[in-house]
């Protein structure tokens, strides 16, 4: 039975799913806006939001936890120095998921995931 199980399987093994969500989180922190399928976008929120909350308090322990989840030094530095300070006053809801129509090949529902207080000077990825 599938009672009280949280999270989506996304038709992947647990290792593949974990690696995919890690890569998507790194891409989101790097570009601050990514395009993906709607179920992946909704699942990505569950990875990104706690990381930004963690980064609000800049300690060595928190940086190590973030590195353990992202495995990218440059992105961890950006998360703690640029992204988290922008969201200091916000009590959650750091990323926005916008529906973006359907993919041509298989009509999969697409979505744009963006950080709420992202810099507008960033070029959009369409």
Swiss-Prot record:
<keyword id="KW-0689">Ribosomal protein</keyword>
<dbReference type="InterPro" id="IPR000456">
    <property type="entry name" value="Ribosomal_bL17"/>
</dbReference>
<keyword id="KW-0687">Ribonucleoprotein</keyword>
<dbReference type="GO" id="GO:0006412">
    <property type="term" value="P:translation"/>
</dbReference>
<protein>
    <recommendedName>
        <fullName>Large ribosomal subunit protein bL17</fullName>
    </recommendedName>
</protein>
<comment type="similarity">
    <text>Belongs to the bacterial ribosomal protein bL17 family.</text>
</comment>
<dbReference type="Pfam" id="PF01196">
    <property type="entry name" value="Ribosomal_L17"/>
</dbReference>
<dbReference type="GO" id="GO:0003735">
    <property type="term" value="F:structural constituent of ribosome"/>
</dbReference>
<dbReference type="GO" id="GO:0022625">
    <property type="term" value="C:cytosolic large ribosomal subunit"/>
</dbReference>
<comment type="subunit">
    <text>Part of the 50S ribosomal subunit. Contacts protein L32.</text>
</comment>
<dbReference type="InterPro" id="IPR036373">
    <property type="entry name" value="Ribosomal_bL17_sf"/>
</dbReference>
<dbReference type="InterPro" id="IPR047859">
    <property type="entry name" value="Ribosomal_bL17_CS"/>
</dbReference>
């Amino acid at each position: 039975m599938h009672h009280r199980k949280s999270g989506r399987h996304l038709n992947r093994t647990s290792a593949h799913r974990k690696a995919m969500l890690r890569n998507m989180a790194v891409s989101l922190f790097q570009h601050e806006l990514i395009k993906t399928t709607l179920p992946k976008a909704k699942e990505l929120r569950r990875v990104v939001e706690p990381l930004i909350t963690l980064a609000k308090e800049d300690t060595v322990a928190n940086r190590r936890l973030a590195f353990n989840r992202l495995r990218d030094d440059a992105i961890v530095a950006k998360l703690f120095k640029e992204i988290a300070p922008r969201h200091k006053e916000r009590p959650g809801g750091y990323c926005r998921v916008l529906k973006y129509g359907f993919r041509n090949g298989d009509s999969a529902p697409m979505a744009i995931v963006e950080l709420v207080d992202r810099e507008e000077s960033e070029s959009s990825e369409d």
